[in-house]
Amino acid sequence: MHKLIFVTGKVGSGKDTLVKIFKDLYSFEPFFYGDNLKTVLLYAGWNGKKDLKGRKLLQQVGRAFRNYDEDFWVNWLFDDICMYIDILDYFSNNDIRIIIGDVRHINEITRMKKIFTEKYGPTKFITIKMIGPNRDPNREMDKETTEDISETEIDQYKDIDYTIINNETVNIKDLHSMVKIIYEKEFQDS
């Protein structure tokens, strides 16, 4: 059975670290909605910095495309995933293991589940929410960027399978242990 993990959380909560652990331990292929947005902006001359000015640009342009078509970023990432799967299928007949590491909007889960299942059939989906209070105080955020819909909408999504509190007491070993527990519970027999 195919496996697809959605990871959500605020800036600095540890999403990228969690994705890396799933990749390293269980060969999940990471994908990020933000990669395509960053590609568009780099092509347009953005310097790639995620300072306050850069974050505002990411949020504003991302929102502009979502206003044009709510599923714009979902459909683009799905196309990227399909291309990866086509290559994977060509070389092997392994199960598909995907992890999307930067879910910020509800449709990024619901729409992806729908179109993925339509194309690839039965799939085990899980959603992990990372909560990292005060995890990275060096991030440049202001009230506007902190309260942007890209930082707040996902809080309304209630179908979270696992919540990881990634505070000052959690170290990398702890995260590895949590990932192992989740994997064994959700995927060991599939």
Task: Write out the residue ranges for each language-model feature.
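P-loop (Walker A) phosphate-binding loop of NTP-binding proteins
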Residues: K10
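Conserved lysine of the Walker
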Residues: K15
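Hydrophobic positions on the alpha1 helix immediately C-terminal to the Walker A/P-loop
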Residues: L18
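Post-Walker A helix-loop "phosphate-sensing" segment adjacent to the P-loop in P-loop NTPases
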Residues: D24-F31
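ATP-dependent NMP and nucleoside kinases share a basic, alpha-helical "lid"
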Residues: E29, F78-D142
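ATP-dependent small-molecule kinase phosphotransfer cores
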Residues: Y33-I98
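Small-molecule kinase domains that catalyze NTP-dependent phosphoryl transfer to phosphate-bearing small molecules
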Residues: P122-S190
